[in-house]
Design a protein with these regions (language model features):
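Short, acidic, small-residue-rich periplasmic hinge/interaction motif at the N-terminus
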Residues: 38-45, 82, 88, 93-129, ...
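Periplasmic N-terminal accessory/gating domains of Gram-negative outer-membrane beta-barrel systems
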Residues: 143-146, 170-172, 184, 202, ...
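Transmembrane beta-barrel wall of Gram-negative outer-membrane proteins
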Residues: 336-360, 376-420, 438-460, 466
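C-terminal beta-signal and adjacent terminal beta-strands/loops
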Residues: 362-365, 767, 776-798, 815-883
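Face-selective signature of the C-terminal outer-membrane beta-barrel domain
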Residues: 398-416, 439-593, 608, 612, ...
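Surface-exposed extracellular loop regions of Gram-negative outer-membrane beta-barrel proteins
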Residues: 417-419, 424, 470, 537-538, ...
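Outer membrane beta-barrel strand-and-loop segments of large Gram-negative receptors
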Residues: 503-505, 555-559, 645, 649, ...
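Gram-negative outer-membrane beta-barrel transporters
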Residues: 676-678, 700-784
Length: 883
């Protein structure tokens, strides 16, 4: 078997070969005369030229390529300074001799003496909602910018008339002629496109083709609501699971394992506030309600300096502000959950609100079932009751003090509750046994966010944030028998365990755009952390006849820490081909009298080979001061978070990434990326059997180790009038080493060598669309015994046991499934919209491996393993009404 490094080196060679072939496949050169350019425009743009033979169309053309310019821009570029005038009439371009005038001067390079002014403002949709990552492009000078996380843009241009194009994916472009003779405030409203989207990213500065970062993916509401939805409920995390380089972990769970990292190595931000518990129903649903999600920026490499605190990924989720002009909303009913969303003005044009509530109703379905079962239970049968539900509540109030000043109050409250009860009346045997339990876990986040336009070039944001995370387990056992007196017996026990995190702090961030070629971001934040990993109370009362014994215990672990971060980054456009994003993130983490310091440099560079081909590379370092202690690979209420202590080092990673991004035509977008990441001071809890590892002196019960993760990722996207295709493939290796656990490198549990996704969506018209997605990846790894040993007789018959060698030494069978669904949209005469969704999970009912049963075959002296799968085909339905 060839080593993994051979395949990785082979992949790098193929990547470089792809670059060379792609570059060589481009046209060798454009036509060299104006006439040849006219012939090319005639063929490609389907236009005809009418002109006198005496016109100098044979002169050499020395201007830029016309290939990717719109017709009006191509014509003005072609005939500029040629002595030829033109006018367009339908499909004809009529040429004439230009009137004598002073020859046009060549463009002057920008200098301090050139008058420059700043165009700035907000880009919004027709509901008044700001648009993140919208593109603002000056077709006159060929420079542009994008809106920030608050929809604000700033573009400094030479004095004079400019043609500005405003664009956003899924919206109609808007062009405005701006006479710039001083600083100009221009707020722009874009209308949602009525036509189906096509991949036209040449002008989208946030597209993978044109942005500087590697490993960035931006997801809007349309991406979330048009992709596959498990149980017909769109989900942020499950959408991200389909991205190349991301493993989902356990089936049906909203796990996120990025470039070999653990689930606690992802930074989840909700309106800039960290979120610790990101799942409901043990991971079946994520905590993000897509009814209020405006934009998701996902980074798996090339992290900008403004982010820090986690090793593997950043998920930056922004929510909608609310309509400033009219009240509207939606109601959704799904198989297991539903929700309502409402937004509108509190004061027209000044203050808006946006609220959304989502709740599961599994408890409403199971409650009558258990009532009927318990009513019909026999005298000797237990009466059982199980109740579970979750809810999310999002609320946001936004107020505009002026065109320059805005204040927003955001709140999120998410909670899961699981109650169980088991009662045995003894069936006439003279005893009673009652057991109860309550599990409660969730988040409460709130932030007060103030933004202010200091000047047309300078944007400021100041926020106060508070985060509360809770996991609480309570259980009771009550057993009694006999009559009260000397012959009676009773046992009573009660256990209460609670884990909490309280974070309070502030952050200040600033955007400064001195020129179109520089976008400076800098800021800092401070957070006070209060961790309570475990606080438990235990009461035990034993009554035997006339005696009574009571035992009571209390344990608590508390840690406080302060964290300070500062960052600075600059997005630099060196020229029309080279762009650079460089910066540094500095952090101080103080705990138990010790201060940890980190300085993480970040750098990303892009070379724009042509408007349709770019090359990128990046290097980032990340430091992480918090860890999640868990005994399973699903989110359980027994998991808890702890900070780095004076006994341990913060986790640290270095990551290199490089890739090629190309758009062969307006329908296709292709990318190929390679990455290599090495991590140090990773943690692994020593062997523990039970629901919750003890938090008392937890830092003495973990092993420190390191990781090595590398791979190649290919992505393809195609969109035409009715058809949309997406495909991705990942080839990766994930290895870890913990010397105190196993002295050599071993594969990670989610070392899925191959991962492939392919999806298709077809719009039939009249609001009907059909979609399907096929998912494949190599099986997760398992640790299986290699030997079965009989230990010698020590006086009581001896014993037998399994012996283990390398951790994660076996791969489970490959995982694959097909999901299909159909959407039906209907708009009523009064403008309301009805949406029906039918979907099928695991359409061909392939039972993928959930666990493996291991047995010793004594006849053959070998170990036998059999995989077990339990998740079958799952149909679902949802109905949404928008009003």
């Amino acid at each position: 078997m060839k080593p993994a490094h051979f395949y990785y080196k082979l992949g790098i060679v193929l990547l470089l070969l792809f670059v060379v072939v792609s570059a060589s496949a481009r046209p060798k050169g454009d036509p060299t005369t104006i006439k040849q350019q006219m012939e090319w425009l005639h063929k490609t743009k389907k236009i005809n030229f009418t002109y006198d033979a005496s016109l100098p169309v044979g002169q050499v053309y020395r201007g830029p390529s016309l290939k990717h310019l719109p017709l009006d821009k191509a014509l003005s570029t072609l005939f500029a300074g040629s002595g030829i005038d033109y006018r367009v009439k339908g499909k004809y371009v009529i040429l004439s001799k230009a009137q004598r005038s002073a020859p046009p001067l060549p463009p002057k390079p920008a200098s301090a003496s050139t008058a420059r002014h700043t165009l700035n403002g907000f880009v919004r949709d027709t509901d008044g909602e700001t648009l993140i990552n919208a593109t603002i492009w000056d077709e006159t000078t060929g420079v542009g910018t994008t809106t920030n996380a608050y929809g604000f843009y700033s573009l400094t241009l030479p004095e004079g008339d400019h043609l500005i194009k405003y664009s956003y994916i899924g919206y109609e472009d808007k062009k405005l002629k701006e006479p710039l003779h001083g600083n100009l405030r221009q707020d722009v409203t874009l209308s949602e496109s009525k036509s189906l989207p096509e991949v036209v990213v040449v002008g989208d500065l946030n597209s993978p083709l044109l942005n500087t970062q590697t490993g960035k993916r931006s997801i809007g509401p349309s991406d979330l609501k048009t992709g596959y939805a498990l149980l017909s409920s769109p989900d942020v995390v499950k959408t991200l699971q389909q991205v190349s380089g991301v493993a989902e972990g356990v089936e049906l769970v909203s796990g996120l394992y990025v470039h070999g990292g653990n689930s606690d190595e992802n930074l989840f931000l909700l309106d800039g506030t960290p979120l610790y518990q990101i799942n409901h129903t043990l991971g079946l649903f994520s905590s993000f309600n897509v009814d209020v999600v405006k934009n998701v920026d996902f980074y798996k490499s090339g992290f900008p300096a403004r982010y820090g605190g986690r090793l593997s990924s950043v998920v930056d989720v922004r929510t909608t502000d609310g309509d400033m002009h009219r009240v509207h909303g939606s109601v959704r009913f799904g198989l297991l959950d539903g929700g309502i969303q409402l937004e509108g003005p509190l004061q027209k044009g000044k203050t808006s609100f946006n609220i959304a509530l989502r709740r599961s109703w599994l408890d409403l379905l199971t409650r009558p079932i258990f009532a009927i079962v318990n009513k019909n239970a026999g005298a000797d049968e237990d009466k059982v009751n199980v109740s579970y539900f979750f809810h999310d509540f999002n609320a946001k109030i936004t107020h505009l003090f002026s065109q320059r000043s805005r204040l927003a109050l955001s709140t999120y409250w998410g909670q899961d509750r699981l109650n169980t009860k088991d009662e045995d009346d003894g069936g006439g045997m003279g005893y009673r046994d009652l057991s109860k339990s309550r599990f409660n876990w969730g988040n409460f986040n709130t932030s007060l966010d103030w933004t202010y336009i200091v000047s047309p070039k300078f944007f400021a944001n100041i926020s106060g944030v508070y985060t509360y995370s809770l996991s609480k387990l309570w259980s009771k056992e009550d057993f009694s028998s006999g009559e009260v007196g000397d012959g009676s017996l009773s046992n009573y026990s009660e256990h209460d365990n609670q884990s909490t995190i309280n974070d309070i702090g502030y952050r200040a961030s600033f955007d400064y755009r001195p020129t179109p070629h520089h976008h400076l971001r800098f800021g800092h934040d401070f957070t006070f952390h209060h961790y309570r990993p475990q606080g438990s109370n235990h009461i035990y009362i034993d009554k035997n006849g006339g005696r009574s014994d009571t035992l009571q215990s209390h344990t608590a672990s508390r840690l406080t820490a302060t964290e300070w971060n500062a960052y600075a980054e600059d997005e630099i456009r060196l020229n029309h081909r080279w762009s650079l994003n460089g910066g540094i993130n500095v952090a101080l983490f103080h705990i138990q009298g010790k201060t940890f310091a980190s300085a993480d440099p970040r750098a990303a560079i892009k070379f724009q080979v042509s408007p349709r081909l770019s090359l990128k590379a990046s290097y980032t370092t990340m430091t992480q001061f918090v860890h999640k202690i868990s005994n399973a690979y699903i989110d359980l209420p027994s998991d808890y978070w702890v900070p780095t202590t004076r006994r341990l080092h913060p986790m640290h990673s270095h990551q290199w990434a490089a890739g090629i991004y190309m758009q062969p035509d307006k329908h296709w977008l292709l990318s190929l990326e390679g990455y290599y990441k090495c991590s140090s001071h990773l943690l692994q809890y020593t062997n523990w059997i039970g629901l919750q590892p003890p938090a008392d002196s937890w830092d003495t019960k973990v092993n420190e180790g390191k990781g090595r993760f590398f791979g190649l990722e290919f992505d393809a996207h195609y969109a035409a009038h009715r058809l949309q295709l997406d495909a991705s493939y990942t080839l990766s290796w994930n290895k870890r080493k913990f010397d105190d656990y196993y002295p050599h490198w071993f594969y990670d549990k989610f070392d899925n060598r191959h991962k492939a996704n392919a999806s298709v969506r077809y719009h039939f018209g009249k609001g009907t669309s059909l979609y399907a997605e096929w998912i494949y990846h190599s099986g997760n790894r398992l640790t299986l015994p290699t030997q079965y040993v009989n230990f010698p007789d020590l006086g009581e018959g001896g014993s037998q046991d399994f012996l283990y060698d390398v951790p994660n030494n076996v791969s489970a069978p490959a995982y694959h499934r097909l999901d299909i669904g159909v959407d039906l949209h209907h708009r009523t005469k009064n403008g309301h919209e009805r949406i029906w969704n039918w979907s099928i999970y695991n359409a061909y009912c392939h039972l993928n491996t959930m666990w493996v049963d291991v047995k010793y075959d004594s006849d053959h002296g070998t170990m036998r393993a059999k995989s077990k799968g339990y998740i079958p085909i799952i149909p679902s339905f949802s109905y949404t009404f928008k009003f």
